[in-house]
Amino acid sequence: MEFENLTKEEMEQLQKIYDDTISFERKIGIIIPTIFAVIILVGLVGNALVVIVAFGRQMRNSTNTLIIGLAISDLMFLLLCVPFTAVDYAAPTWIFPEWTCSMINFFQHTSAYCSVWTLTLMALDRYLAVVYPVESMTLRTPRNTVIALCFIYIIIIASQIPVGRMHGIYVYDFIMEKRSTCAILTIATAEATPTMARTYFMTFNVFGYVLPLGISVVLYGLMLRKLWDMPRPGNSQSVGGRNLTNRDSGSSIRRRPEATAAKRKVTRLVLCVLITWALCWLPLNVCFFMSGLAYPEPLVISHGVIMVIVQIASQVLAYTNSCLNPILYALMSQSFREGFIRVMKMLINKLSRGRFCTNYRRSALRTELTHYNQTPAHPANTVVQVSNGERSSLLKDNSSSATSVQPLRTSIQAKKTKNIGRSKSTRSYNL
């Protein structure tokens, strides 16, 4: 950027704008990565617990298979997208290789599409379970669910390859310095026609939000009408021309309200997951839609700094959705809640047991060294016996000799070598 023709007042104004922008970016560069770090931590732990619990033998059904697929999509998003975006907020330039720009945006779009279409499959699964409970039993199996997920994921992956290839590192002038970021090059340089740009933005709006959400809303509407017509416990039913309550009817009728109540609980959980997703992704989709309408003029130019804050907040809200589903499962599903507690107890027991064993080995080693130091250099009738490094004892043996100290030295040296090797192997994983 040329500054020779600027007056002193213009240079002062430009310097003030630059200083204010840098100050704002520094604050954002601390706040947003911190929020993303919390999202990553909560999301990784929560979704990993969901996968572990849902893989249990007693939890194997079509709905939980879809929940596993949704958790895997969130894990992919948390591992391959959020960390790079956090660094991008903290650094003024793109510090990663160029291929990472394409990879991140490919996985970001893929995981977003996989999540929403998995939610649509969950709505279809609930619809079949409620409206056609008997007819759909052979169709709603974990195996068929995995086949449906793979079919949809293959289509999504194939369709998002061009989106990944469209992205690259865009270098631009920013007041007094050069910067770079990851963006769609044809849109960032305004080389794309308005039709091309709007096609990109609105394709995501339609196939990544409006269409799957619309299908899910229709399915839930039909499902809720069916659930509303189902009898509740204690209501009278007509059987054989006379009215019977659920208590004095046959066993199959008695069991029907309990099964209906269970279906209502599962349907309520899946519906809450869908509503949460829709609310979290709505602001970002609105920003996408407005960006398509405003192209080639950026929204920041037409709406000012307030639009920057809105775009950042909408992105943070969309990313937050990746860690909310496990919280909903824990709050609304007793089976998941009990599974989470069971897995956490198991992990805590293993960690505490491992810490106890480590402390026990250290104590045993100190005891051996103490006995060794207190033992005469040439004992006449004492043998130090060590059993696997776990305990030591002094046993009297008239047939022992001074050479019995050598195995102890060998054992201590072996322990030191083992600990050093363990330390090196552990350090090698700290990349």
Curated annotation (Swiss-Prot):
Residues 415-425 have a biased composition (Basic residues). Disruption phenotype: Decreased roaming in response to food during the L3 and L4 stages of larval development and adult stages, but not at the L1 stage of larval development. Increased lipid accumulation. Pfam families: 7tm_1. It is found in: Cell membrane. Its main location: membrane. It is a multi-pass membrane protein. GO terms for molecular function: G protein-coupled receptor activity. GO terms for cellular component: plasma membrane. The chain crosses the membrane at residues 35-55, 67-87, 102-124, 144-164, 204-224, 269-289, 299-319. Residues 1-34, 88-101, 165-203, 290-298 are extracellular. PROSITE patterns: G_PROTEIN_RECEP_F1_1, G_PROTEIN_RECEP_F1_2. It comes from the Eukaryota. Glycans are attached at N5. Residues 56-66, 125-143, 225-268, 320-431 are cytoplasmic. Keywords: Cell membrane, Disulfide bond, G-protein coupled receptor, Glycoprotein, Membrane, Receptor, Transducer, Transmembrane, Transmembrane helix. Exclusively expressed in the AIB interneuron. The keyword Cell membrane applies. Residues 235-257, 393-431 are annotated as: Disordered. Disulfide bonds join C101-C182. Residues 235-252, 393-414 have a biased composition (Polar residues). Coiled coil: none annotated. GO terms for biological process: foraging behavior; G protein-coupled receptor signaling pathway. Belongs to the G-protein coupled receptor 1 family. PANTHER family: GALANIN-LIKE G-PROTEIN COUPLED RECEPTOR NPR-9, LEUCOKININ RECEPTOR-RELATED. Neuropeptide that controls movement such as roaming, foraging and backwards locomotion or 'reversals' in response to environmental cues such as food availability or volatile odorants such as octanol. Antagonizes AIB interneuron activity to control bacterial colonization and may negatively regulate the expression of immunity-related genes such as pqm-1 and dod-22 in response to infection by P.aeruginosa. This is Galanin-like G-protein coupled receptor npr-9. It comes from Caenorhabditis elegans. The lineage of its organism: Eukaryota, Metazoa, Ecdysozoa, Nematoda, Chromadorea. The gene is npr-9.
